[in-house]
Amino acid sequence: MAIKKYKPITNGRRNMTSLDFAEITKTTPEKSLLKPLPKKAGRNNQGKLTVRHHGGGHKRQYRVIDFKRNKDGINAKVDSIQYDPNRSANIALVVYADGEKRYIIAPKGLEVGQIVESGAEADIKVGNALPLQNIPVGTVVHNIELKPGKGGQIARSAGASAQVLGKEGKYVLIRLRSGEVRMILSTCRATIGQVGNLQHELVNVGKAGRSRWKGIRPTVRGSVMNPNDHPHGGGEGRAPIGRPSPMSPWGKPTLGKKTRRGKKSSDKLIVRGRKKK
């Protein structure tokens, strides 16, 4: 999809861009694949705020996506490419030969009328899902499982992909976009190709109200708060932090502090860590 620019008729329109949605072929979703999506506003089941900057936004319905791709041996025809408000990638409605309909993540190059399939015998073609042990080295993949049968968890957002680097025993080496090289069980499934909607990262929101439509609330700096609200708060004028390192609102070190849990069981599966920026 191409990037659409706007004339600067207002301050909000100046520098604003959006996608032209040329790839979208159908605007109304499949009703049988919709579920209600109640607003949480960043609260947990106790009503306590657990995620800041969430709240409001346009009403949405959840599209049930087939991340498992476990319907083997039956061809499916791509019926339409649709917009999904719950993710950055577009989704494709596929209709199987037995009449069942499912949504899948729409990879780059997938077209209406194309046939997709899943299973160990599937061809190495964009949109097909296979076990990693059946995918040739060097192939670009997305929607990768971490546990067999659990469904794809890695490389699902717009433009995301990973590459098969090699095979060692019951594991397959995968290089992620972060530069991390990881071992994944060869029986886990992945889908061929790169996730579509590559231009998504180039969109300029343009104004605060557009973020509010998405349910994103303002982020306030700690330095402009009072000392009872944030460790950075207080002082006269633009005062420094007054601490050895930046702190989170709860007084924990942040901005560079490692947050991954130590001695995690999957550490032994990471061959090379992600690249430093």
From Swiss-Prot:
Respond yes or no to whether keyword NADP is given for this record: no
Q: Which Gene3D superfamilies match?
A: 2.30.30.30, Nucleic acid-binding proteins (2.40.50.140), Ribosomal protein L2, domain 3 (4.10.950.10)
GO terms for cellular component: large ribosomal subunit
A GO BP entry is: cytoplasmic translation
User: What keywords were assigned to this record?
Assistant: Ribonucleoprotein, Ribosomal protein, RNA-binding, rRNA-binding
Entry keyword Disulfide bond: no
- The annotated region (Disordered) lies at 36-55, 213-277
InterPro entries on file:
NA-bd_OB-fold, Rib_uL2_dom2, Ribosomal_uL2, Ribosomal_uL2_bac/org-type, Ribosomal_uL2_C, Ribosomal_uL2_CS, Ribosomal_uL2_dom3, Ribosomal_uL2_RNA-bd_dom
Q: Name one GO molecular function term.
A: RNA binding
- Cited function: One of the primary rRNA binding proteins. Required for association of the 30S and 50S subunits to form the 70S ribosome, for tRNA binding and peptide bond formation. It has been suggested to have peptidyltransferase activity; this is somewhat controversial. Makes several contacts with the 16S rRNA in the 70S ribosome.
Q: Which HAMAP family match?
A: Ribosomal_uL2_B
Q: What family name appears in the similarity comment?
A: Belongs to the universal ribosomal protein uL2 family.
PANTHER family, per this entry? LARGE RIBOSOMAL SUBUNIT PROTEIN UL2M, RIBOSOMAL PROTEIN L2
Q: Subunit structure of this entry?
A: Part of the 50S ribosomal subunit. Forms a bridge to the 30S subunit in the 70S ribosome.
Protein name according to UniProt = Large ribosomal subunit protein uL2
Q: Name the source organism.
A: Staphylococcus aureus (strain NCTC 8325 / PS 47)
- Lineage start: Bacteria, Bacillati, Bacillota, Bacilli, Bacillales
